């Protein structure tokens, strides 16, 4: 959980306690996911669930930790879509599906400004183009500063496409962390906080 994109303000006390057990090595990530699922399956009969918003945060945080702990990675739009499906299965009815309508949203990360996202009918083509451009990047010939700028440009482009109706920022963050791992980096959520 130390590597997950986890915001304690959005998470339940139950998740935090369960995460501590995982960090201490007392339980596996599979056990964490099972415990979180059981916790919310029985929430209707319990009075100690803090508020409705924690279920999504808790389930997704556990799934992020699981995905980041896996060695597998494929530099493809399909892998990005699969991350979205795994993060939000059972949370959103559209998990793992490219959005089917145009959207605009005020983004907290931009102090409430809006962004022009890719048109829904061009999402797949735009993803394919951005991924093909990134695949052709010759990182060994770049300085560290050039490489960082190039990766940032690629990641911000994927985010601006906004391929999903919801969950784009977390999906892009997890994909980015997996991608950076292929370069030998061990990123954690602090790179997304500042």
Predicted regions and their residues:
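FIC/Doc superfamily catalytic core
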Residues: 1-194
